[in-house]
Amino acid sequence: MFDIEEFLNLDNYATEERVKRRKINTKNNDPSGEFFTPYSIVKHMCDKVSDEDWSDPNKTFLEPSFGHGQFILFILYRRIVEYNIDWCTALSTIFGVELMEDNVAECKQRVHKMLEAIAPDYNKDKANNIMNCNFICHDFFTWNFEEWRPMTEEEIKKAKKK
């Protein structure tokens, strides 16, 4: 069985490279302000969302600085496993902006790994199509949100067929 708490345990992602980069960023007062949220805080914050919002397949979630995906993964997991929303719909309603390109790539890899474990009908190409639209490498404060929108029901159906 897939254990979301273990999967989101930051110790599993404290790679030597990440620790080294974090030390350099801190030492040089890097403006990226990179910080990775522990599972306990992610869960506590997500527990504030109502059951009605979790279960509504039309509700969207926006993570303004998603790092390597702690909130995105928790939201996706909860909507699929606890609220029985199909993986394609759940993923298509999650949006994220991240400044660091390597974090975007890592988040996408982690989403694939989790979906392989929890979604029997998971399709990597479909997931990539959705994530390439919904997970953006950009500065949150300068991104044009007016032109960024959730996929329509028709677009979701088309993505599911591919």
Where are these regions (language model features)?
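SAM-dependent methyltransferase catalytic region
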Residues: 1-162
